[in-house]
A protein has these predicted regions:
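Hydrophobic anchor at the beta1->P-loop junction of P-loop NTPases
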Residues: 90-92
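Switch II of P-loop NTPase G domains
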Residues: 157-209, 216-224
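Conserved GTP-binding G-domain of TRAFAC-class P-loop NTPases and closely related GTPase folds
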Residues: 201, 207-383
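P-loop (Walker A) phosphate-binding loop of NTP-binding proteins
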Residues: 95
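Long, basic/Gly/Ser/Thr-rich N-terminal segments
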Residues: 1-85
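Flexible phosphate/Mg2+-sensing switch loops adjacent to catalytic phosphate-binding sites
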Residues: 82-83, 111-152
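A conserved segment at the C-terminal end of the G1
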Residues: 103-113
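Conserved glycine(s) of the Walker
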Residues: 98-100
Length: 383
């Protein structure tokens, strides 16, 4: 039996040798140095070749066994069974006001809720993930009925930690466990040299990218909605919307992760706030009606529904994107698809802060299910 020899750290996204993973003593009475690494001569050749599993605990100088594991690169504590899971990191990128935090909140809520139907179980892999999701995502939306504050710019070690989950798909001998890592980054970070060192590794090593775009930034959509609701009801104009896919592409190419002319990381282009744009464009009503009907993704990925929505969204984008850049840029990714969703299902009141009720999302799951299908992790049905 062969064991994994390398993993991508779910916190700093560096590629690390499993045999180099360190340990941390959690004994409160320990007087030695808590974090330590195994002496090189204690690592057997069989382990280095992947013919023997790495230990899950190691004796510390204080006499206790250390079980907490730490990354040799960033020195942060990583999940204990990180080397036993297939890793799937999903980069969620979006321009300002595209609704990244609301999307992450409702996607995780949906994954949990659909466990029985899809035969999976989602488990947070560390306390940071449990606390972050509860305090920064769940409570604002479902307890306080407030919108979530915007994603902070990445500032080195000050950046909020990724949300790390174990997703067990299937049951018994045929079950498969994957490590899901969600990291939401602001699109403006991709142009800030001081931030790129952290984001680069994450995006370039991602298993899939969900690029969130705000349709209210498209000029033709704005014209219709401004005449109907007034300019003050719309978010501030942000030119990043038409550039973000191009920025992601350039970042990946700069770091040599593109094979050939097209990038092989699957790209899901997802437009948020689609409940707000029904009258914006000749194709908008058809898109709206399809998006807000009952989903056909019941326990599997429905190919027919995906193709229908993807085609409708492409036609709508072609109509409302005057620059014609979004469709063109997406073609630089070998696998790309278009989606529309609403994370909240309503428009926050009172300066965009208050919700009248619990959020009722529509279609937040579609990009995620498509990415799982690209990796062969869920079944597909034709209709």
């Amino acid at each position: 039996m062969l064991f994994k020899r390398y993993i991508n750290c779910p916190l700093c996204f560096e590629r690390i040798k499993i045999s180099d993973i360190g340990f941390k003593c959690e004994n409160p009475g320990c007087k030695g140095k808590p974090a330590f690494f195994r002496p090189p001569n204690s690592i057997s050749p069989l382990e280095k070749m992947g013919l023997k599993s790495a230990p899950k605990r190691y004796p510390h100088e204080c006499g206790n066994f250390a079980t907490a594991r730490i990354c040799p690169k960033c020195q942060q504590e990583i999940p204990t069974d990180v080397d036993e899971l297939s890793d799937m990191s999903i980069a969620i990128i979006g321009a300002k006001e595209s609704g990244k935090s609301h999307y992450v909140a409702m996607l995780i809520h949906w994954i949990r809720r659909m466990g029985m139907e899809f035969g999976w179980n989602l488990t947070a892999m560390n306390e940071v993930t449990i606390d972050r999701y509860d305090q920064e995502f769940w409570r604002p939306l479902f307890v306080k009925h407030e919108s979530i504050r915007s994603t902070n710019l990445v500032r080195g070690a000050g950046q909020a930690a990724p949300l790390i989950y174990s997703l067990c798909i299937g049951r018994g001998l045929l079950s498969r466990r994957i490590m899901l890592v969600f990291f939401d980054a602001a699109g403006e970070n991709l142009e800030d040299a001081s931030n790129l060192w952290y984001i680069n590794r994450y995006i370039c090593n991602a298993s899939g990218i969900i690029c969130l775009l705000d349709p209210l930034q498209l000029s033709r959509v704005r014209e219709v909605l401004a005449s109907k609701y007034g300019e003050s009801s719309l978010p501030e104009i942000n030119k990043d919307t038409g550039l973000i896919i191009n920025r992601v592409e350039n970042l990946i190419r700069r770091h040599g992760n593109a094979r050939g002319n097209r990038i092989d990381i699957p790209l899901a282009v997802a437009f948020s706030k689609m409940d707000f744009v029904r009258d914006a464009g000749e194709n908008a009503a058809g898109v709206y009606d399809e998006l807000f009907r009952e989903t056909r993704h019941h326990g599997a990925f429905c190919e027919a529904e995906f193709k229908n929505i993807d085609g409708l969204m492409r036609a709508w984008v072609q109509e409302v994107d005057v620059s014609a850049s979004i469709l063109a840029q997406s073609e630089n990714f070998e696998k790309n698809a278009f989606f529309g969703f609403s994370a909240l299902g309503c428009n926050p009141k009172g300066n965009g802060e208050r919700l009248d009720r619990d959020p009722r999302s529509f279609r937040v799951e579609d990009p995620f299910l498509w990415l799982l299908r690209q990796k062969g992790l869920i079944k597909a049905m034709k209709g």
